[in-house]
Amino acid sequence: MFNIKNHLRLPIIGKREPEEQPDPIDHDLHVQRLRELLYGLDLMLDDDAQGVKSAFSDDTVESAVGRSGSAFYNAILGLEPKAIEEATEALYHAEQVTEERKKHFEHHDRPIGSYPAGMELQLCLSDIYLMQSALGFVSDSIVDSMKAAYRIRKTFLSFSKMMEHVRDVQHKKETGEIKSLSPNATFIDEFIESGVITGYGVLTFLVSMFPPSLSRILSLFSFHGVRKESLELLWRASKYPNIQGAIALLCLYAFNAMIQSLGSIPPSNYDQELEHCLQAVKDIRKRYSKGALWAVMEAKIYFLTGESQMALEMEELSIDSSMEQIIAMKGFDTAMLYVGMRKFKQAADAIIELEDLNSWSHAFYRYFAGCCLLQHGKEILGSGGSEEEAKASIDHGIEYLKNAPTLVQKKKKRRTLPVEAYLIRKVQKWEDRAEKLNISIADAMDVPPYAELIYIFVICSLKDPKEAEALRADLETCKCSEEDEAGLKEFLLGVIDRHLKEYDSCRVRMEHVLQLDQGYLSRDNRELWILPFAYYELAALYWDMHGMAAEKEVNHYLKKAQEFNDYDLQNRLSMLAQAATQTLQSEK
C-alpha cells in the first residue's frame, strides 16, 4: 500500500531540522599535501622543472599555491614582463582558493599543532600577498606599484599577528609548557614557524629599504622595518631545512651580494657576513646539488671576497639548468666579473649572449657591450697590437652604442628603466658633441664610459689595488675639454683615492666636484648625477676614516645627497642612501 510518510518528510512541530554537517577534514591527508607542497618547491630550487610540473599537476589548493610560487620564482629571477604577468595570474588564482580553504578550516576544524586551526593556510595566503606586492613593485605599471604599496600593509599586519603567535608558542616550548607533539603536529608547527619567521624577516627587510618619503608615511600606521632585526630573523630562519630556510638565505644573499656590493658604506661586519653567506651557500648546495642558482651565488661571493680567480673558474663552467633565467643571471654576473677584471672582450661577449635568454633590457646589453668593445679596441692600440683589429672592435662598439637607444624606443607599453634613461642621455650627449665638433663618437668621449660602468655596477672590484691603479691610469690620461667631463673624471679619481686610502686627496676632489654649477650640469645632457653622488662619497669617506665616530658627518652628507631630484641614477642613490642610513642605525 502506498504510504505517504515514506515519500514526504514533514517537519516535526517544535523541533529544528539538524544542520548539514561539513565534510570531515582528514588531518593526515592535509599534512601529506603540505609535505608534497614543500617537496615540489624543493624540486624548484633543485632545477627539476619537470618534477615541479608533475608535483603541482592536480587541482588541490596546495598545488595552486605551488604553481604560483614557481611562477613567481621564474618572474623574479628574470623580471620579464610576460613572466610577471603569468605569475600575477597564478597568484590571484592561488589567493582565491586558499582564502576559501582557510575559512573552511577556521570554522570547521580543530588545531593540529600548537597554533590556531587554519594558521598554516593563513601563512600560505600571507606569502601570496608578499609575492604579489613584490611583483607590483618590479612591474612596469605605476598602478600595480600603488596596489603593491597598499597590499604590503595588509601583508605586514598579517605577518605581525602571526609572529606574535610564534613568539608566544616558542616561549611556551622553551619553558616546557608545551611538551611533546605528534608527528603531524610537529610538522605543522615547523611549517608555520619557519614560514612566519622567514616571511616576517623578508617583509621587514623590504620595508627597511623603502625610501624615507614612503617610510615616513607607512610609519604613521605603525608600519616600519628595522634591518638589524630582520637580518637576525633571516639568519635564524635560514637554519630550517626546507624551502623557507632557502628563501631566507636567498634574501640574505640579495642584501649582501647584490645591494651592499653596489654601495660604498657597508656594515662594519660586512666581510664576516659575506663569509657567513659563502659557508651557508656551500652547505645548501649539498641539499640542492643540481640547483645552478646556488653555484652562481657561490661564484659571486667569491668575487666579492677578493677571490676573483676562483669566481672566474666557477663562472666559466657550463651549467646544466632548465631555467633560462638562471643561465641569464650567471651570464650577467660573468659579464660584470670580466669588466671588473678588465677582460673587456669577454665582458662584451657575455652580456650580448643575454639577448637570446632574457628580454629585461636589450638596450642596456648593447650599451654595456659597446662600452667594453671601445675599451678593448683602445687597449689593443695601447699595447701595440693590430690597428685593423682595434678599429673593428671600436667600430663594433660604436654600432652597439648607437643602436642601444633605438631598442628602448621599440619597447611597447613598458616604462623606460632608469638605466635606459641613463644610456639614452649618454649616447645623445656624445652624438651631439660629435656633430658639433665634426668628430667621431669615440673621439667625443673624454672619460672612457667603461669607468662609469665600474662605479655603477662593479665598484667592489676597486678593493683590489691593482684594478684601482689600472683605472686610475686610464683616467689620468684623459684630456677633458668640457667642464662636466672634467668633473666626472675628478669624481671617479676621488672614488679611487678613497679605495686606496688616500683620504685627503679624495676629500679635495669631491669638494672640487661640488663647486660645479648645478644649473650648468642640469642642461644639455650633462653629468648632473655626480653632484649627489659626490655627497654620498663624502659620507663614505668619513665612514671609512672614522666609522660610527663620524655618524653626524655621515648622516649630514647622506641627507645632502638626497636633496637632488630629476637626474638619472636617482633611484640607485636613494637605495644606497637608505641602506647606509639603516647601517648607521644597526651599528648603534
Swiss-Prot record:
A cellular-component GO term for this protein: nucleus
Q: Give the UniProt record's GO annotations in the biological process aspect.
A: cellular detoxification; cellular response to misfolded protein
Pfam families in UniProt = Iml2-TPR_39
Q: Which InterPro entries match?
A: Iml2/TPR_39
Per its record, how is this protein called by name?
Uncharacterized protein C11E3.14
